[in-house]
């Protein structure tokens, strides 16, 4: 699972952001 680099904050790069 690659982390979405589009997330501005690392805390936002969580499951909720992964759904985006």
From Swiss-Prot:
**What keywords are assigned to this protein?**
Ion channel impairing toxin, Neurotoxin, Potassium channel impairing toxin, Secreted, Toxin, Voltage-gated potassium channel impairing toxin
Name one molecular function that GO assigns to this entry.
potassium channel regulator activity
Q: Where in the cell is it found?
A: Secreted
Predominant subcellular localization, coarse grouping: secreted
- Source domain of life is Eukaryota
State the tissue distribution: Expressed by the venom gland.
The UniProt entry's GO CC annotations, sorted and at most eight, read: extracellular region
Family the entry assigns: Belongs to the short scorpion toxin superfamily. Potassium channel inhibitor family. Alpha-KTx 02 subfamily.
- Job description of the protein: Potent selective inhibitor of Kv1/KCNA voltage-gated potassium channels.
Domain remarks in the Swiss-Prot or TrEMBL record = Has the structural arrangement of an alpha-helix connected to antiparallel beta-sheets by disulfide bonds (CS-alpha/beta).
Please identify the protein, giving its name as recorded: Hongotoxin-5
């Amino acid at each position: 699972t690659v982390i979405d680099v589009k997330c501005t904050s690392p805390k936002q790069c969580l499951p909720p952001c992964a759904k985006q």
